[in-house]
Amino acid sequence: MAGFKPTPAQSKAINDRGENILVSASAGSGKTAVLVNRTIELIKEGQSIDRMLLVTFTDAAAKNMRDKIRAALQKIVQDSANPKDLRDRMSNQINRLAAADISTIHAFCLKLIKRYYYLIDLDPQFRLLTDETERLLLQEDVWHEVSEELYRNAEEKVSGKASFSELVLNFSSDRDDQGLDDLILRLYEIANAQPDPEKWLQKLPDNYDLGSGSLLESNFYQQQLKPLVIEKLNQFIQDYRELVTRASDNGLDQAAEVIKSDEELMHQLLSSLGGITVSDVCQMMAQQKFGSFRGRPAADDPRIDVFKDIQKQRNQLKKQWEQMVSTYLGKQEAQEPIAKEELLTELTTFSDQFTDLLSKATESQLDAKTVDSLQKDQQMMQELLDLLQPPTWNTIRDLFANAKFARMGGKPKDDELAEEVYKSLGSARTGIKKQFDQLVDRFFNYREDQFRLISTHAQELLRELSAVTINFRRRYQQTKLNRHVLEFSDLEHYAYAILTPPDDQPNWQTLVKDLQNHYQEIMIDEYQDTNRLQESILMKLTSPERKNLFMVGDVKQSIYRFREADPTLFLGKYQNYRQGSDGEAIVLGENFRSMTNVTSFTNILFEQLMDREVGEIDYDEDAHLKYAATYYEENQDNKVHPTEVLLYDANALDPEKEDVEHEDDKLAGEFRMIGMRIKQMVENQELIFHPEDGQMHPIQYGDIVLLERTKAINNSLMEEFNKLNIPLTVHDVESYFQATEVRVMMSLLKIIDNPQQDIPLVAVLRSPIVGLTNQELAFIRLQNRSVDYYAALQTFMSNYQRKALRHQSLLTSEQVNALYEKADHFLGLLRVFRQTAQQQTLVDLIWQIYDQTGYLDYVGAMPGGHQRQANLHALYQRAHSYEQSSFKGLYQFIRFIEKMQEHDKDLGVAPTQLTANTVNVMTIHGSKGLQFPVVFLIDATHGFNKGAARENAVVDAVAGVGIRYMDDQRVIYDTPQRQAVIEEIQRGERAEDLRVLYVALTRAEQRLVITGSFNEEMRTQSLAGSWQRWQKAYQSKNLLIGPQPRITANSFMDWVGLALARYPEFNAQQLSRGNVTLEESTLADTKVTGLAADPHFTAKTYTALDVSDGLAKIGQNASANVTEKNNTVATDASEQKIEQILRYRYPHLVATKTTAYQSVTDVKRVFEDPDTRDMARWDYDQQQKVKTQGIYLNNNFDVPAFIQQTTHEPVATEIGTATHLVFQKLPLDEGLINVEFVDQEIQKLVGEKLINPVVAARINREGIVAFYQTAVGQKILKHPADYHREVPFSMIMNGHELFKGVNVSDDERILIHGIIDGYLRTDEGIILVDYKNDHLNKDYRDFDLARIKDRYRGQLELYKEALNLMEGIPVVQMGLYLLELGEFVLFTKEGD
């Protein structure tokens, strides 16, 4: 692939100025390249990188952005063809890059707070609550305190005010008050995402304030209920119109008339809500037709003259009517306003005149047919008048509750196609009717007096709820301040406070103005995932006249609603900017990531599924992915493989299974099917294209990623893949604590804390750590049945020693002896572990368990051992981070973990590298921003979350809170407000579900596979039932499927099925398997307008037998390959083997006498002179030990710090260690480094008990200061962010590279571990620094310098090698800083 060549749209995004710009960047459209290149162009135009703000979504994205900008600047600097002034300016910008604000919003807020904390009276010494569980525990502790106070001070019921006790009763169950606890914390989280949390909380009761006037004038009705019902009715009208068209096209005129009456009913209901405008009424007037005037009397009938007079007047009225309608339509076409009062007067006049004619006909006793004609005329006028009359709630409610739907007659006979159409129309009509009934039940159950009464009581509850939540929030904020901790949302609120100066603070206001002037350009990446508070912060840094905002995102990829991300911020600007209002919208639609099979398949799905109603944005031409990854075409062998849709039907051939097994069987079978397909890809060496070398390569396991919606399936997935011997790495394991190895460790930790816990104890005894059998466990219990199991174990030990065992006949004497030995060994370990738990850290305890039980190594040898070891390492790491928090000790750690489990918080295991040759599994959310050659979207039949409808209280940031109300008699009333909030939540969730599907599909580069599973005995999960739902796609001939089938979909697969059902490749015959036969709809031939011609997909259903056969064939192929290779072996292989065994000599004898682990400190001593004064002795005996034993380790252990004497004269090692600590901790971003500054830092470290005062007095302060006056030190001060201190590393080296005496043939690998004092990343490469306290004799300066350099050369060479491996860029300088001389001594070449 060549260098970056922007498309026209990318060029606009890079070069347009003078407007706020919103870039809608579809997946794979090169938005990062746009951001980087825009930054470079702005710099070329004279802006400075340190006067820009570039906000990213993650720290990794910020680092990536900074690195790319640096690389782009370096490229300009290194290009000698560029003018010198340009290169100099770019070089200057590289120097400024470290100080540039390229960070997450939280990092930027933290920087603001650290700089301006004094404005808001905040103590700058705080710790961030980065651990979610620690934050949760702290919240629960504070809420417990608050709720206890509220319980103690609970008041009696006061009229017009709810008490705390009523709040608890209303929102808690009969078992506990967890419901209220959860609601308070949920309200806190949502409020915290608002610019003014307390204001948001105070407004919560407003939805239940129906005012003193008409209910129809209330805010709730006008702003929530009315728009919601109007939207629903319009959806029904749209669906009915499509059904009318289908009925008419197939000659079903009677059915069409009935469905048309349904549509007219919806129009009438719409008009009752005030949803009909004057313009709508004019259009309906134009559609009205006067019927014939019947019932003419005979010529000799005396009533004939009256009839003729009425007929003449009616004809005149008809003519006047037509003229009036024409006039109003003309005004509409000319876009002239039509006054409602004017139209109302006209219609009233016509209605009165028709009423007069009707009265005259009745009084004259004209024929009934004549009277009927005039009644219809008058009724038509009255209905039009009613459309313009203000309704009441009760009349509306009655209209909805009493709506009648006609019976659909006219069923065709002897016409199969017409019968099928008629049947589908009836089914669709029934579905719409069901949706309408649900609408009525949810919103039109109460008359106005009932509605008001329930709302009043609910409002009282919400006032109390709001007050309690505000109380909790204030207490929690104060607790955090008292403990000097802040959470991420606090950073945002305090930053917002800094940027919002009071009116009476002119200096503060000037500071904010200066900040606004400082940032010449504000660029926001992933703008679609911004919340309202973050938006407010960023808007405070600009002003309308500056027009310096550049926002990049893709609302189709907004998938963080659960974190309070608000995609409507993006949508609002996008719609306004596209209309030329306030800014410029630019669309990046080219996809440089995926092959045409992925882009085409994605388009054919979303052009049928996504619009503003479902997805919140139209999938129009701009939104379509445009294939632009033309580099795939560089290799002619690179064939486009269609997207695969693989369906697994769990019991298509086995309907006898019990219900309880269905879900497990369904998922397990799907996972085996996936494993089969992966094995086919890998073992059949299916090819993919590698853009790096332009060649085709066989698919490897590491090329494949499985994307999932939920982590809950991971344990089952790992189990099935282990059986198939497919290597698997799972990212973010759900139910981490359910993994066997983790459960065993947690059980062991629990009994170390308290062994008198039966279940954990038995779990450990049964585990491989002890290895008791069920029979042995039972034998122990029989020794004493009346005590806990630990006491029974003690009884067994005592009885064995006293030879008084009970029920001894159950085991042989050998078995009893073996049991005693295992139990004795375990109890010995338990004693040691319990002692460690009391005296040492938790980390030490866990590592001791791994070491002394060998459990870490054991699980590594199990199937899936790689992942199991990662799980145990994660527990160790979690314990380490736990000990950095405010919680301490084993008991608290166990409580900590139990809380994590209660709240479904996982450790989020960081497994091995993604590039390892294993199949990787991650959530769709975890994959965002990544791309993979082969993507499986698995478990696509997993049901959507629709739990909101079951909650007593539901919360939405925009719609507010909706609750059920329980009266004094404990009767529960639902409220229309709650149903309105549920509707808003579900609408948002379905829109986000659709966007999550989009993200999943667009991760794929070359292959895309979608899988799902079904169960025929469960109606909602059966393939047959799903197939019927997918057939609803035929209800519309339009490309966009009707709203109802899309809204009522239950899973990703439902959406995929709806879109693909319109293609012949997705047919009943293709998908039927075993005893499940799907019926092809006769509507399948329906022509859909705009449907893509080449869908690029295949679909197939598998049964358990199909998967077994497929796996067997793969095994046969593998066996055949092995047999073929074996046949090429020489016939005398057996003789050769025997001779090899007899003559064998182990080639690494020397290595058996050498340790496989060496520290750099120890290796360094092999190179250095042994006469260093006051250092740890490396004496003759030790060197002899090296020669004879090959052990390169220091046997002199340091004296533990807690028993060191503080009065002795410090030795060089102590001073050296303390000096290194000062170098490590010294702040480098303060500018000037002088002796006073260094001394302050040393005293600070003494105060923190990190340095002994006696040792501190001997630290060479002048030597430290002098380092930062050297050329290297000055570079470090200019770029402190690029200087890395005390960096640990481990690497593996060959033995012959380290030690003499190890022959080349004895090339054993040795693990080297060390800590690098410091290194600086520069444009040219790395500068490696090592500090030394060595004494030099000034009379022999040159001699001593040469000696010191020779001593440490080997050590620095090892560091250099490690840095080359770690950083991937060369070490261009390395040297020793000698504190005694105050000089930086460079190593230039070997032997200098």
Swiss-Prot record:
GO cellular component: a single term: DNA helicase complex
Primary gene name: addA
Heme keyword on record: no
Positions that bind ATP: 25-32
Catalytic reactions on record: Couples ATP hydrolysis with the unwinding of duplex DNA by translocating in the 3'-5' direction; ATP + H2O = ADP + phosphate + H(+)
Protein's recorded name: ATP-dependent helicase/nuclease subunit A
GO MF terms, alphabetically ordered: 3'-5' DNA helicase activity; 3'-5' exonuclease activity; ATP binding; ATP hydrolysis activity; double-stranded DNA binding
Keywords linked to the UniProt accession: ATP-binding, DNA damage, DNA repair, DNA-binding, Exonuclease, Helicase, Hydrolase, Isomerase, Nuclease, Nucleotide-binding
The protein's role, per its UniProt record: The heterodimer acts as both an ATP-dependent DNA helicase and an ATP-dependent, dual-direction single-stranded exonuclease. Recognizes the chi site generating a DNA molecule suitable for the initiation of homologous recombination. The AddA nuclease domain is required for chi fragment generation; this subunit has the helicase and 3' -> 5' nuclease activities.
Domain UvrD-like helicase C-terminal per the UniProt entry, residue ranges: 623-929
GO biological process: double-strand break repair via homologous recombination
Transmembrane segment boundaries: none
